[in-house]
Swiss-Prot record:
GO terms for molecular function: 2 iron, 2 sulfur cluster binding; metal ion binding. The gene is fdx5. One of its GO terms (biological process) is P450-containing electron transport chain. [2Fe-2S] cluster binds at C36, C42, C45, C81. This is 2Fe-2S ferredoxin-5. Optimum temperature is 106 degrees Celsius at pH 7. Highly thermostable.
Amino acid sequence: MPKVIVANINAEFEGIENETIMQILYRNGIEIDSACGGHGQCTSCKVLIISGSENLYPAEFEEKDTLEENGMDPETERLSCQAKLNGKGDVVIYLP
C-alpha cells in the first residue's frame, strides 16, 4: 500500500489509490484546516510535496488555478483535499 509520510511530525500513514491526502490525514486523527470544506476553493489545506509527486494524480485545472492565483507552485504545493494517490508509491509531505 502506498503511504503518505509527514516529514515534520515524523509520521506515516497508509492510503489507497484515489484517496486524497486530506482523507488519509483525517482518518488517522490529523486535523488540517479546510475553510471551503474540502472543495478545492481555498488554500487553507495546502501541503508541501517534498518527494513522490509522481505518485499523485496530476492537479486538475481548478486546483492549479487556485494555487497559481495565490502565488503557489502546483509542482511543489498541492491542496490536500484534491491531491489523490495514484497507488504507485509513497508521497512525502510537509504540513505548514
